[in-house]
């Protein structure tokens, strides 16, 4: 089997050596800035990070059938690739959940320390996946009141989030579907919200940044 691997995926070489008969693999490492269609023409499996955009142009006439991403989420895949049954696609869902939650909690702690917010204020969580669930669990352990909104799971209401002084965003990004998240936080949301701080560790496109700039809200993004 011919493997095409991003050379910045940590520990990949070490893990491959632990696989029985690993010497049967034909391996080529690539720099994510230089990956082209020609590279994919001689590979059966592709291992990437979120820095690689996977689309029809990249995979045209390629024998690749397996794609593994060392990051969570599918934002770097074009929909026509995701919907093509030719490809088996795997992502590392939740792999960075702890790191993201630690960053969010650090932001909240700093805001409390600087007296931008008080510790007993209500927090809102948008998106109840791996990160949202872990954040909620820790907030419960810290006795910090919070509300959750995830329309796909039928949890909460967006209007409830408007009452929260701090909103932390962990939703997946989409422009289509039953509940598109593109510019979910916009002038309509902000106009009726008592929110003072928005922490966005998800995709930037979930925020209408012009609306944020025209508001008094403190916006934190990683």
Where are these regions (language model features)?
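NAD(P)-binding Rossmann-fold cofactor-contacting core
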Residues: 141-156
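Glycine-rich adenosine-cofactor-binding loop
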Residues: 7, 93, 119-140
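Structural motif
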Residues: 5-9, 29-31, 48-51, 70, ...
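Rossmann-like adenosine-cofactor binding region
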Residues: 54-58, 152-222
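Phosphate/diphosphate ligand-binding glycine-rich loop within oxidoreductases
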Residues: 44-116
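Phosphate-coordination loops involved in phosphoryl transfer and adenosine-cofactor binding
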Residues: 64, 119-123, 195
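Short, charged/polar "capping" segments at the starts of alpha-helices
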Residues: 10-15, 35-37, 74-76, 154-156, ...
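N-terminal glycine-/charge-rich "phosphate-binding" loop or analogous flexible N-terminal tail
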Residues: 1-43
């Amino acid at each position: 089997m011919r493997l095409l691997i991003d050379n910045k995926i940590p520990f990949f070489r070490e893990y491959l050596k632990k696989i029985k008969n690993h010497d049967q693999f034909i391996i080529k490492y690539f720099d994510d800035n230089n990956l082209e269609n020609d590279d994919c023409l001689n590979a059966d499996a592709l291992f990437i990070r979120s820095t690689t955009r996977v689309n029809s142009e990249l995979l045209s006439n390629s024998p690749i059938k397996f794609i593994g991403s060392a990051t969570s989420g599918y934002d770097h895949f074009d929909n026509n690739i995701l919907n093509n049954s030719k490809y088996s696609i795997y992502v590392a869902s939740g792999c960075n959940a702890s790191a993201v939650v630690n960053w969010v909690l650090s932001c909240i702690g700093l805001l409390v320390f600087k007296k931008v917010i008080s510790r007993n204020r209500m927090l809102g969580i948008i998106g109840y996946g791996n990160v949202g669930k872990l954040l909620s669990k820790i907030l419960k352990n810290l006795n910090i009141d919070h509300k959750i909104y995830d329309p796909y799971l039928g949890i909460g209401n967006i209007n409830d989030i408007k009452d929260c002084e701090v909103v932390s965003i962990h939703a997946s990004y989409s422009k289509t579907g039953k509940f598109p998240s593109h510019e979910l936080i916009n002038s309509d949301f902000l106009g009726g919200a008592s929110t003072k701080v928005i922490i966005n560790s998800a995709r930037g496109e979930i925020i209408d940044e012009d609306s944020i700039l025209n508001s008094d809200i403190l916006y934190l993004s990683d």
